[in-house]
Structures are given as C-alpha cells and as structure tokens.
C-alpha cells in the first residue's frame, strides 16, 4: 500500500510538470503544446523596422536623422533608407543579410548605395556584423561586432517593427 501511494504521488508530480519551450504564437518556433515558456522563443527579423536609437562610437546620433528605416525581405535582401536631418534626399542602401540559427548574430553586406542625386546606384561593398542583444516581434536591439567601415569602433542600434 505504501508503494502504491508513493507511485501515485510520483505520477501526480510528474504529470503536473508542464512542457517547457516557446509558447508565444508570434515566435517562429512556437509550440502550442508548451505550458511553460523557457525563454527560447525566436522571432523573425523580416519586415519593416524603424530606428529608435543610434549610438555611434559613444555618441547618440539618433536626432541627426529625420527618417531611418530598414526592410528585411524573405529572400535575405534588405533595403535601408534614411533621410539626414535638414536634407531633402534620402540615402538608400541595399544588399543582403544573414541571421544565424540561434538569432545571436546579424550580418549585413551592402552592395549598392544611391544618394538620390541623379547618379543612380553605385556599387559599394561593406560588411558589418552585429551581436543581437534582443530580437522580439516588436524590437531589434544590436551592437556592432565588426565592420569594414573605417574609423567606426562601436554602434548600438535599437529598432522597432512597424
């Protein structure tokens, strides 16, 4: 009888443990059978993102832009458009991006720039890799790991999905 009670108690304890995983339906690894979120949710970087904070080499330069948007497309291409404050021409960049499987590093390879000055697209190859500090369905927060851009040692970006 004592063994039966212990056995039944064990079943109740084990049965009450919920399945852990990602229970956010907005995540790309959502599992509807999960009852306890374990912090492993992964979110898509695809879509339109708007700049909230841009810190370059320790200086907050967010206010130097009237607009700053990046569009991540499902073919791993991106388009970045920004309008410097007081300017009338957007500067457009395009290229490809790679987000690693664990969503911890995001690499951009710029292929072209257009200053919208009548000269069209000009080839420019620049590679920048960022550490993804946070990626949710609403926020992308990243810090520069490496770049080909001379004289740039640190970048912190916070973007909001629009």
Residues covered by each model-derived region:
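Conserved beta-hairpin
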Residues: 70-78
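Primarily marks secretory-pathway-exposed extracellular/lumenal segments that are disulfide-
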Residues: 4-8, 14-50, 57, 63, ...
């Amino acid at each position: 009888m004592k063994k039966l009670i212990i056995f039944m108690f064990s079943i109740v304890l084990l049965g009450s443990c919920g399945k852990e995983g990602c229970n956010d339906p907005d995540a790309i690894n959502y599992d509807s059978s999960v009852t306890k979120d374990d912090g492993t949710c992964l979110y898509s970087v695809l879509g339109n993102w708007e700049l909230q904070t841009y810190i370059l080499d320790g200086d907050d330069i967010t206010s130097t832009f009237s607009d700053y948007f990046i569009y991540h497309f499902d073919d791993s291409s991106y388009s970045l458009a920004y309008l410097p404050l007081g300017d009338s021409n957007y500067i457009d960049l395009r290229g490809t991006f790679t987000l690693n499987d664990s969503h911890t590093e995001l690499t951009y390879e710029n292929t072209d720039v257009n200053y919208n000055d009548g000269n069209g697209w000009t080839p420019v190859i620049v590679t920048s890799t960022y550490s993804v500090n946070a990626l949710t369905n609403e926020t992308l927060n990243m810090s520069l790991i490496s770049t080909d851009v001379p004289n740039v040692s640190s970048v912190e970006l916070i973007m909001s999905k629009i």
